[in-house]
Amino acid sequence: MWKHIVDRQQGILNFTEELISAIGKTRVLVAGAGGNGAVLDFLLRVGYQRFTIIDFDFVEATNLNRLPFTPDYIGKVKPEAWKEYLQKVNPGSSVTAYSRKITRNDESWLEENISGVDIVALGMTDFEANFLISRVCHRLRKRMVVGPGTSNCWVVSTLTNERGVSLESVAGFGTDHIDARNVDYKALLPKYMKIYMFPGRIEKLYPETLQKVRSGDIPPRNCKIFVSMVNAASCWELVKNTAVINGIKLQNTKIIEFPLIQIFDPFKGSAYYYNAAKERIGIPNWLTGRIRWYPVTT
């Protein structure tokens, strides 16, 4: 089945036999099996077939607006639901599913599992889990792709974890030498949110809706249109990273290295970059390839 799945993409720039073969062998850990986790469907259909999935939640009826499940999946644990779905599409795929809520006490467990994969896609909504996974990836020098599924934009970035840049350093947490079990996550949350609250993001919700989401009165808002954009962005970023990991040269594209974040705003029809460390917006010139940087104005 795998050969049939990857057949139609051969001949697209960068999708060489060498890269497609590497994709089929790459081990991907997807942390979070909700809207962000729907990248699994994209990954499967470009040829990835070795997955580890972590989540603790169950499939609900409201998940069907963005996940490729049918009503008979409702009530199933999400990682197991994804395993069933992925292996229906490609029976040759290997899927390890963990129903587990990641907490500050899971660092050694995460290290064991992340050390056994090639790359990580981070898609959890819980800050404590994201902090811990980011820290372990940085320690193990594992590349990690991120893209907030509730941003209502195409948005993506890669923590390559090769040049000393980490989530903790860019956010200014000051936690580098603090045991994860002793971190005050509640106190750090505003700094974390600031990184991903790129210019233009809050404009995608009505003010009263934004207030209800922030207060916890309603879950984060999402829509298949925009979640799929983030999934596509993350999948493409994972493909590019797979090439780099395997020493395959990319043509006419490159990795979006954190603290740089790539954004396409479908409401305004404009693409730009956001440097989360310097709080600057970069406007690319399609003709010249140059980026002009501006300070963020409030």
Regions found by a protein language model. Give the residues of each.
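N-terminal charged helix/coil linker that caps or initiates catalytic domains
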Residues: 1-29, 61, 257-263, 275-276, ...
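Glycine-rich phosphate-binding loop and adjoining beta1-alpha1-beta2 segment
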Residues: 50-91
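Glycine-rich adenosine-cofactor-binding loop
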Residues: 19-60
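E1/E1-like adenylate-forming module used to activate ubiquitin-like modifiers
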Residues: 116-230, 257-298
